[in-house]
Amino acid sequence: MKWIFTLLLFSFTSVQSQQTIKILSYNIFHGEQAYKKGEPNIDSVAGLINKYKPDLAAFQEVDSATGRSESIYKVRTDFIAELARKTGMHGFFGKAMDYDGGGYGEGLLTNKPARATVKILPTPKGGEPRALIYIDYPLSKKKRIVFAGTHLCHQFEENRISQVNEINKTFEKTKPPVILCGDLNFTPDKEPYRILSTAWNDAAILKGDPQLTFSVDNPKVRIDYAWLKKGHTFKVVDVQVLPYDYSDHKPVLITLEIQ
């Protein structure tokens, strides 16, 4: 009887120690409907968030109080602040560069308070500046994870290689589990993918049957990812590429169990 009780207690404890988390990654095309020029998409993106209720979300191509946002929304708009307001989540903006009187870069939403760090990534070939934003997220009272979002260079392979090397270096000694999401602008046959794979697992590959993410009207490539830092126990419950056309990229929804 004592043996049975101990076994049941162990099983209960194991189940209790598993945490399920839902994550969204989405390139939002600077807040504009990709196939309806001049039409805003933030209400649509907020509706998507409210429907699927992710715990964490990473966004790319995010404007903050730019002239471009004013041309679409009639007022200079901080997209992450608006998404946070419309969803009840906590928002964090990571500026990669000054743009049109405001900022342009990455954004995160979380369902719990957190603190964000922003790091500018290297661009040895020049081109558009890029940033990495990440937070220390309280998964439970006793467990924390790191959640990161980025958007790598679309112009030069040398930049992407430097950027993934910098990401690997940034999290090399991080003890909590790390999840990295974003539009990485490379396909699985390229060198940056190989470099990232030395330290991370591609969630869609772990799940099986990875789906194309770009472009929405004619999907030909998979460039939007969730990566899981090696050395930690992640179970990929689901990876969905969602069928929405609010941007030129498809949103990716990931469900994980973390031990």
Predicted regions mapped to residue ranges:
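Bacterial Sec-dependent N-terminal signal peptides
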Residues: 1-20
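Structural recognition of the beta-strand scaffold that forms the well-ordered cores
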Residues: 22-25, 56-60, 91-93, 107-108, ...
